[in-house]
Amino acid sequence: MDAAIQYILYFAVLVVLAVPLGRFMAHIMDGEHTFLSPVIAPVERGVYRLLRIDAAEQMGCRRYLASVLVFSGIGLVALVALQALQSFLPGNPQHLPGVSWDLSFNTAASFITNTNWQSYSGETTLSYLVQFMGLTVQNFLSAGTGIAVMFALIRGFRQVKEQGLGSFWVDLTRTVLYVLIPLNLVFGICLAAGGVISNFQPAQKAELVEPVAVQPNADGGWSVIDGAQIEGDTVKVDGKVVEGARVVTEQFLPQGAAAPQVAIKQSGTNGGGFFGVNSAHPYENPSAFTNIIEMTSLLLIPAACCFTFGIGVKNTKQGKAIFAAMFILLVIFTGIIAVNEHMGTPQLADGGAVNIEMTDGQAGGNMEGKESRFGIATSSTWSAYTTAASNGSVNSMHDSYTPLGGFVQMLQMALGEVVFGGVGCGLYGMIGFAILTVFIAGLMVGRTPEFLGKKIEPGEMRWAVVLCLATPFAILVCSAIACMVPGLADQLNNGGAHGFSEVLYAFTSCGGNNGSAFAGMNCNIPWINVMLGLEMLFARFMPIIGTLAIAGSLAKKGKVAESAGTLSTTNGMFVFLLVFIVLLIGALSFFPALALGPVAEFFQMIA
């Protein structure tokens, strides 16, 4: 019963906060006066004067796209350079060396695309300067870019026989100044007050209560030696000296300005953790209070975008219908994950090895890879939220979820991040499916499809297909190529179906601009870093190209009057059709691959 209340609470908080934020963002899109205008409007005008931006400019789709690509390209180059020169720059109290070329490219591609895939551990790889001047800045700018493209799409539906979609520079500036900075100022203060660390001290060392013996392992790291007898610097097991063993007497305690970066990594659906284990780390997410802030902010802006869309196209029912479709999918997927994690696996219960019954003293179920301070309900909800959005942050280890739990996580990412998805990009991804839905419905009744008063013709359909299939194409092609590389098996912690799931999850995460990982695959080698980086760039910018092409085409068209034969896109039937089409495309595209991974593992589990 307590778990059910938790699930209801998480969903309710999301809906209650998303509605007013959606209205506020609609006002920002049109440059209307808001309660923040007296403070921020002078700053906004100053930015325009400094950068010589014409606030009244109307860009066509090609110029808008060129601005997006040039801006992102500059960010890519700057972030690569910042990492490469890390050892020569200030703000590096640990004296960390420069980052290798392949990891620099992978990380830069990851953060400018809002993916935040991490082939590294933040506390041991990147300096404070790179973290806040490089990664945190891109967290704001990549999120702002996604929202700006969504604004352009809204104007495409709203304009009548016009060329302009607004100005990318104005949309980006307003989004960052009015939405992202104020929102994350509040979140950052709340997180710091809740115990998330925020300082610029170098890492600390603490004496262990008891020394620990470790030895080198096959992965190049160190493993604890069970049953070791420690005599000074000598380690023995069963009276025999263990060669190459070390005695650890100190613990490494990382520090840094985590709270501000955690705030934007959540609300901007970025997801890249300040620490290697992300929001499972007690310095990044220490309590239930910080957890609900981080988890709610994860989907807040993507959910609000639905209501912004409805207000922007002057059809609030349409925004509610899109929200309903996304919300239904989220509830279904969260339920599947939760049920499987609460049930656990036969192997856990075999012979009474683990008590998987829920009691007052324990969560029961599959607690492997989950933090005891969060339990199954909170961990399952977070995993559903983070793979629904293009976020990828974690408060538990997805590699340790049950086969069907991992199946749902992969499926949500594989759908193209349309179950709310990323800030801005989730909305325009779902609009691609909505256009596909009205086209299929039009074929069934023999009418030219219409959506929001605009005729959907072959040009829009071609780009809608690109929008819907860019992610599946990137994921499946890159996964197939990787599986043909002979050395891939050496980078996996597991073989068989779960090993394939680790590969598929990595490429699904990057292709879906998500960034989470099963973490059972060593991705920090040159060819994998480069392949994942290229996949992230393709999967980010191909949908943007398709979205702006659709927006530019629709803006030139006139409005079509509704008639008795016009398909309603705001009722329950359309919501059902939209959900069905999303699941159908996902099933047709990914079931063969998923059958070789999590589905096969599920049948092995119950055999």
Where are these regions (language model features)?
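Membrane-proximal intracellular helices of multi-pass ion channels
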Residues: M1-A607
